[in-house]
Curated annotation (Swiss-Prot):
Lineage: Bacteria, Bacillati, Bacillota, Bacilli, Lactobacillales
Name of this protein: tRNA pseudouridine synthase B
Record GO biological process: mRNA pseudouridine synthesis; tRNA pseudouridine synthesis
Positions of transmembrane segments: none
GO terms, molecular function: RNA binding; tRNA pseudouridine(55) synthase activity
Annotated organism of origin: Levilactobacillus brevis (strain ATCC 367 / BCRC 12310 / CIP 105137 / JCM 1170 / LMG 11437 / NCIMB 947 / NCTC 947)
Length: 303
């Protein structure tokens, strides 16, 4: 059993919960997810089965799209509503749509981001959330991220009693982006505390929300002996790579890891190629400027 399940992760489940449940349903241990979603976040979570676990890094490298909401006027320990409130600054009046749009624009493009203390980023061999739970502080490394777009839906809703303003947004960003930190940063741009209120992942690994299946769907497909209706081919993770179809002779060479010239593959030295045989993506080959040949980068199947 090999392929990618574009799973819809429900709120309340961890990403590992989904992996564990699928291992039980599918009766296989070779299951891996392609990017953690917090328990309070729902949406697209591609899960790799069998030999498809080899493409996890390629799925994770793709950009993500999220829809959610940010609440201005308070802050929590975790930067979302799961944490304890550590600051309140009631708003006397709502920010205008132009003000929040300008704040979002300042966070668009290639920027530096510091991951939250309640995250799985490791520092000196320990996860940041382990330091946080122990009441310890540690210097957090910044990372470079790209926010392709940060669209806000107007000025949102103002709660005069609570002194808060909640604004819906949609974000397209690179891997490794903490959206709850972007919510906090939006507040900083406006000079007020902020927290991410809700979040749904709309796209990941090339899969959209409309393409996902639920755990119940997978269980039903397994019971009907039709699991293939929930599986997508490995090639979904490799759609951005140039593809070259191999004949029987070239496949015999490739499956044994033989280096190939650009002429043999009829290529003008593309940096990396996805090689297919009989309609199935078998491997990735990478061009070596030093050797002037294509060399194996990752094998997915040899039969």
């Amino acid at each position: 059993m090999n392929g990618i399940i574009p799973l819809y992760k429900e709120r309340g489940l961890t990403s590992f919960d989904c992996v564990a449940k699928l291992r039980h349903i599918l009766q296989t241990k070779k299951v891996g997810h392609s990017g953690t979603l917090d328990p309070s976040v729902d949406g697209v979570l591609p899960i790799c089965i069998g030999s498809a676990t080899k493409v996890v890094p390629y799925l994770m490298a793709s950009g993500k799209v999220y829809r959610g909401s940010v609440t201005l006027g308070l802050a929590t320990t975790t930067e979302d509503l799961d944490g304890d409130v550590v600051e309140r600054q009631p708003l006397e009046r709502p920010f205008t749509a132009d003000q929040v749009a300008a704040a979002a624009q300042a966070l668009t493009g290639t920027i530096q981001q510091t991951p939250p203390m309640y995250s799985a980023v490791k520092v000196n061999g320990r996860k940041l959330y382990e330091y946080a739970r122990a009441g310890e502080t540690v210097e957090r490394p910044t990372r470079t991220i790209t926010v392709d777009r940060f669209d806000l839906q107007g000025a949102g809703t103002f709660d005069a009693t609570a002194g808060t303003q909640t604004i819906d947004f949609e974000i397209a960003c690179s891997k490794g982006t903490y959206v709850r930190t972007l919510a906090v940063d939006l507040g900083q741009q406006l000079g007020v505390p902020a927290v991410m209120a809700t979040l749904t992942r709309l796209k990941s690994g090339g899969f959209t929300l409309s393409q996902t299946v639920t755990l119940a769907d997978v269980e039903a497909a397994m019971a009907d002996d039709q699991i293939e209706r929930t599986l997508r081919p490995i090639d979904y993770a490799l759609q951005d790579y140039p593809h070259v179809a191999l004949d029987e002779h070239l496949w015999a060479l490739v499956k044994n890891g033989v280096f190939l010239s650009a002429a043999e593959l009829n290529q003008a030295t593309e940096p990396e190629l996805a090689l297919t045989y009989q309609g199935e993506t078998k491997c990735l080959y990478r061009w070596s400027d030093e050797k002037k040949q294509y060399r194996p980068l990752k094998m997915f199947a040899v039969n």
